[in-house]
Amino acid sequence: YLQNLFDKIYISDIVERNKILHEKSVLDELLNIISSSIGSLTNPSNIAKTFHSVRQIDIDSATVARYLDFFIDSFMISKAERYDVKGRKYIGSPLKYYFSDVGLRNARLNFRQQEENHIMENIIYNELIVRGFSVDVGVVYSREQNSSGNYSKVAREIDFVAVKGGRKVYIQSAFALPDEEKAAQEMKPFALTGDSFPKVIIRKDIRKRWYDDRGVLNMGLIDFLLDENSI
């Protein structure tokens, strides 16, 4: 049913409305690529390279961007741009794309590629949008020492910077935090924000919510989804 919905409603409508009947196969391939990369940083240029190297199809990045806009205009997907938290400015490319309906995404891939961490991230993004938040991908920077002893500027990511009115919440999506090393990796970007806005990590491996000694709210995924006032 969902696959039929894709072909008969979404794709057919995009093709007819934008008069690109001869490009339907390209649209199909683009949709497959986006379906396979939810929650991953990408841009039209990288996608065009994927067309060339993997699909052996030559297409320019401007055309890819235009077709992605068709998907966005049809409410099939949406994009989250990268935001420099301390610099208070948008970075631009690359960015992330999420499906408005995860079931449609899964059907598109014939229910393969069921990466639970990426699907969970998509679900959290959608729920934040439904609750009226504007959502960006947060970026913070630090100077870190590499294995050679040299220091360099390193970008760290906060999955979501959710803003509604005067409220701002930093959110990490973590399928599981099995050890302290993984927990520290997820928490580090929070410490780099340099502000006191609420910080939340949504996890699949816990049920009850609790605050750690850093003041970060740990919350179970189900708890977050069932309580619209959870953040």
Please provide the spans of the model-predicted regions.
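A cross-kingdom feature that marks ATP-driven nucleic-acid transaction machinery
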Residues: T63-I231
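Conserved helicase/translocase motor-coupling segment
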Residues: Y1-D73, K79
